[in-house]
Amino acid sequence: MADIPCLVTTEMNNMLQMVYTREEVDRAVFQMEALKAPGPDGLLLLFFQHYWKIIGDEVSVAILNCLNLGSFPQSSNNTFITLIPKVKSPSLVSKFRPISLCNTFYKIVSKVVANRLKGILPNLISESQSAFQTDKAISDNILVAFETLHHMKNQKLKKKGFPGFKA
């Protein structure tokens, strides 16, 4: 472990450990998509955004208690896992993909934490990595590998040899 450099500076660590604020909760609520599928609570984020002036104080207190004190209501962690079709009129299980439908409270907590992490992630994750970065997906690497193999196969058929790779 001594040979692995520490990438999280004292300043980053202090920023991550700061007490979460009402402003962070407000920002998260209004950054999120209002019409995403609801979880077991049955509530769309649209409800929270529309009635935030009425319910914002109480919801924020609950979220801040969770984030700052670690008191996370058990029911907030309930999630539905369901299958959604990948194609029109699927006939095989493989033509579905699973998604998790989380409670809105859980989604807001996650967004507040994600916003806090966004400030330091570029310092911790290489730009060449395709996961955990905005506008990138881990599946991008699969496409690059497929295209590389396809190109190599075509080169082999033309008897031009293979490119060299360095690992």
Predicted regions and their residues:
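Conserved catalytic palm subdomain of right-hand nucleotidyl-transferase polymerases, strongest
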Residues: K36-L43, L92-L101, I142-A167
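Short secondary-structure junction motifs
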Residues: S76, E127, K159-F162
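Conserved short loop/turn motifs at secondary-structure junctions
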Residues: L43-Y51, Q129-K136, F165-A167
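Short amphipathic alpha-helices and their capping/turn residues within compact interaction modules
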Residues: A34-G39, L64, N68-S71, K118, ...
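Conserved pre-motif C helix in the palm subdomain of viral-like polymerases
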Residues: S94-I125, L143-L149
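Surface-exposed loop/turn segments and immediately adjacent short secondary-structure elements
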Residues: M1-S94, I108
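A short catalytic or substrate-binding loop motif that flags glycine-/basic-rich loops and adjacent residues
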Residues: P73-S75, I138-N141
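Structured beta-strand/turn binding interfaces of compact recognition modules in eukaryotic regulators
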Residues: I84-K86, T104, D135
